[in-house]
């Protein structure tokens, strides 16, 4: 299924100087200097990035959809106000209304809509988290796994072509957002 083209105006989106990055003017970020982005990142409306807590780094072609909340994970229960940096790997898609508080999100990862990834979770490369899934604290999602449920359970495995699919999907999603002057 091909994604439809979405047309937005320059009054709604802006480009970042470094690379080809599209940021919604409605996104909310705290301490943007603590948020590192690479080429072809797309941050949609009303997302919240908590760069005031610890460093957040997004590799190439990370898609953050509407109303997603991304913040670094608490270090551990004994140090309640210490946060760990969050690294999001290349070609990763995070769906609408998802809340992410992980230690790591690997490459070629798909996280569906309305998902919650709790503190200190680790998502390895090539993982799919289905819509409406809750991943409890300290859980590690293994490579090529498909997870679903409340709490998340392994329900299947991705094939070894997932990285090619996610690369195509994320590039297509990014390219289909066309920003035009009014």
Segments from the language model and where they lie:
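Right-handed parallel beta-helix/beta-solenoid
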Residues: 30-33, 50-55, 81
């Amino acid at each position: 299924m091909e994604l439809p083209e979405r047309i937005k105006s320059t009054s709604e989106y802006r480009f970042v100087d470094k690379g080809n990055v599209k940021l919604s003017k409605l996104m909310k970020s705290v301490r943007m200097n603590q948020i590192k982005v690479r080429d072809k990142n797309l941050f949609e409306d009303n997302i919240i990035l908590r760069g005031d807590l610890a460093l957040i780094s997004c590799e190439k072609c990370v898609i953050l959809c509407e109303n997603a909340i991304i913040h670094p994970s608490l270090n551990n229960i004994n140090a309640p106000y210490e946060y760990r940096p969050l690294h999001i790997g290349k070609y990763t898609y995070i769906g609408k209304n998802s809340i992410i508080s992980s230690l790591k999100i690997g490459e070629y990862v798909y996280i569906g809509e309305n998902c919650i990834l709790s503190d200190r979770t680790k998502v390895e490369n090539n993982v799919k988290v289905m819509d409406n899934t809750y991943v409890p604290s300290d859980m590690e999602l293994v490579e090529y796994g498909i997870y679903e449920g409340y709490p998340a359970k392994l329900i299947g495995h991705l094939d070894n072509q997932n990285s090619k699919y996610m690369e195509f999907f994320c590039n297509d999603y990014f390219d289909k957002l066309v920003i035009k002057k009014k």
